[in-house]
C-alpha cells in the first residue's frame, strides 16, 4: 500500500546494556490503519546518525509491532541519541529517540524471567548457527528466487529457557511461535503454510467460553513443539528486487513471556534477491 492514511508511529521500546560494553536501542511501531503501509528508505524513513540508517523496516503491518529491530552503538556513543524519523504521506513527520539513561526503559532480558523464560535462539536453514537477540543476525538466502515462483524459507529454533520441571505447567516444553513477515522490498510477499506445518485445531467445543479465544495460525506462522525444531514457510514474491524477510521467534505460551513484558523473543532477518 502507498504511504497514506493514518501516520505510522515510531516507538522506542527501551535500551540494553550489552555485556561487551555496547548499547542497543530497541524500536517498534504502531500502524493505526487496518492495512499494511510501505514507506521506502529515504526522506520519509531514516535514522540519524545516517550511518545507522538502512536496516529499519519499510513494511509496516497493521497494529502494534513490538521490538522489531535494534540499533547498536559503541560505548563511546552510548550517551548520544539515535533518532528514527517516519513520515506517512502528507501527515506530519514523527520521530523518536533511542536514548540511554532512564532505568524504567532498561531491558534486562539477558537474565531469566521469574518463571525461567529466556530469548529463544534462531538460525537460518536447518543447521545454521543459532543466536538470541532482538536483531540477532542478518543472513543471505543462497538459493535462486524468481518473481511469482514459490520458494521455501527455513529457520531452526531452540528455546533455552530453564523452567521448574516439577511445575505441572512445564512438564512439556513450551511451544514456540515463529512468525515470518516482509521487512523490506519493492513488491508484495505472499506466505503459505509449508506441507510440514502442523495446523493446530481448536481443542474446545463451540459452546465452551474458551472456544473464541483460540487463534488459528496465520499463513506466515509456524508452531514448533518440543523446545527445538525447524520452521518452514512458502513465500512468493510479486516482483523482482531486493527483499528482507523478518522472522520473530517467541515463547509467549509461557506465563512470563509476552510483548507487554518486552521478553522473550528473537528477531532474525534474511536478505532475498528476486529476479524476473
Model regions and ranges:
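Contiguous beta-strand segments within globular domains
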Residues: 20-26, 142-164
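Short acidic/polar inter-strand loop motif in beta-rich domains
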Residues: 88-95, 251-257
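Short, compositionally biased P/S/T/A/G/V-rich stretches that sit at domain boundaries
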Residues: 8-12, 103-145, 164
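Residue-level recognition of secondary-structure-to-loop junctions
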Residues: 17, 225, 232-239
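Short amphipathic, basic-aromatic surface patches that mediate peripheral association
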Residues: 31-36, 157-170
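C-terminal edge beta-strand
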Residues: 258-274
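Low-complexity "stalk/linker" and mucin-like segments enriched in Ser/Thr/Pro/Ala/Gly
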Residues: 57-58, 171-175, 179-231
Amino acid at each position: 500500500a502507498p504511504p497514506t492514511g493514518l501516520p505510522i508511529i515510531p516507538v522506542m521500546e527501551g535500551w540494553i546494556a550489552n555485556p561487551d560494553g555496547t548499547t542497543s536501542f530497541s524500536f517498534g511501531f504502531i500502524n493505526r490503519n487496518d492495512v499494511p503501509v510501505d514507506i521506502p528508505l529515504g526522506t520519509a524513513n531514516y535514522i540519524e546518525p545516517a550511518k545507522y540508517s538502512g536496516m529499519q523496516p519499510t513494511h509496516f503491518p497493521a497494529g502494534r509491532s513490538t521490538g522489531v529491530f535494534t540499533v547498536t552503538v559503541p560505548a563511546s556513543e552510548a550517551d548520544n541519541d539515535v533518532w528514527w524519523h517516519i513520515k506517512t504521506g502528507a501527515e506530519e513527520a514523527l520521530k523518536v529517540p533511542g536514548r540511554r539513561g532512564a532505568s524504567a526503559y532498561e531491558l534486562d532480558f539477558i537474565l531469566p524471567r521469574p518463571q525461567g523464560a529466556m530469548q529463544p535462539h534462531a538460525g537460518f536453514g536447518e543447521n545454521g548457527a543459532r543466536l538470541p537477540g532482538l536483531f540477532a543476525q542478518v543472513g543471505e538466502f543462497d538459493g535462486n528466487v524468481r518473481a511469482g515462483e514459490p520458494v521455501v524459507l527455513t529457520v531452526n529454533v531452540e528455546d533455552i529457557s530453564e523452567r521448574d520441571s516439577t511445575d505441572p505447567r512445564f512438564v512439556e516444553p513450551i511451544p514456540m511461535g515463529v512468525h515470518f513477515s516482509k521487512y523490506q522490498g519493492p513488491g508484495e510477499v505472499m506466505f503459505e503454510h509449508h506441507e510440514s506445518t502442523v495446523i493446530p485445531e481448536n481443542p474446545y467445543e463451540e459452546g465452551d467460553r474458551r472456544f473464541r479465544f483460540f487463534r488459528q495460525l496465520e499463513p506466515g506462522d509456524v508452531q514448533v513443539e518440543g523446545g527445538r525444531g525447524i520452521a518452514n514457510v512458502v513465500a512468493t514474491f510479486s516482483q523482482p528486487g531486493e527483499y528482507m524477510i523478518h522472522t520473530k521467534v517467541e515463547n509467549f505460551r509461557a506465563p512470563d513471556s509476552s510483548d507487554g513484558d518486552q521478553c522473550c523473543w528473537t528477531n532474525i532477518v534474511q536478505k532475498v534477491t528476486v529476479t524476473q
